[in-house]
Amino acid sequence: MRLSWALFFLAAAATAHGEWTITSAESEAGSTGVVHRHVLLENATDGGHATFELAIFSGKSCALRIIDNPEGERLASMMKRENYVCGVNGGYFDEEFKPIGLRIVNSQMLTPLKRARLITGVLLASPRGVQIVRAREFSQHQKIEAAIQCGPFLVDRSQRVGGLNNSQHARRTFVATETNERALLGFCSEVSLAELANILATTPIAADLKIQRAINLDGGSSSALWFARENGSVFSVPERKPVRDFVGVLPK
């Protein structure tokens, strides 16, 4: 009986962390050195497929901002009007359209840090660059230009985070950083959180960008990504409902 259970758990683990491989990848240039990367992957274990859209940028030439959106404006409209180079939907909000967790917009705190099981990290921009920190690592004593609390953590120290849900599949939005000041905003087709963490930690979807940390943003019908091409046209995955805030990237 114990052997049967052991085999069951081994099979479950193999399913959760099946081998994902890149079947195709294309990159295109945007302004200020931002790159849009379109990646298709296949899972050798179960034949599953996933599509990733990434906007890769440098903290040296770009600034990350959190955009409050109390009126429920669409991502594409906001990005075009304010001359952003790329952006995604932001964090969680409640049934009354109020943000859940920390929000710092233009160096002003709109809502405080919240202790909760799901929103375990903070994406922030400071003079030190773009960072993803654990909620317990967050300090209000440093000069912070923008911050949003979200989660769960997907990758830490280039290793996938364990214990993530593997049964619920949905569109996902996420942010990832590496050690040399580069970061990315990302969207992916319907995968579980465990699958997303596994892909980010084990496949080179961002080419030569080595992901050090990654964190989940609001997903499902909220997921959206927008990118301005170098020629002035745009690539866009629209949200399916209004969202409370956005994560955007501007030229410095």
Locations of regions flagged by a protein language model:
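Active-site-adjacent helix-turn-beta-strand microarchitecture at beta-sheet edges
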Residues: 91-166
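Beta-strand-turn-beta hairpins that frame and shape the catalytic cleft
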Residues: 50, 127-131, 177-184
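Extracytoplasmic
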Residues: 49-52, 81-82, 118, 149, ...
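N-terminal signal peptide c-region/cleavage motif recognized by signal peptidases
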Residues: 11-13
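Conserved, well-ordered active-site substructure
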Residues: 97-116, 165-173, 177-216, 221-252
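Zymogen propeptides
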Residues: 16-114, 186
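Sec-dependent signal peptide recognition
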Residues: 1-8
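Short, surface-exposed charged micro-motifs
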Residues: 54, 122, 174
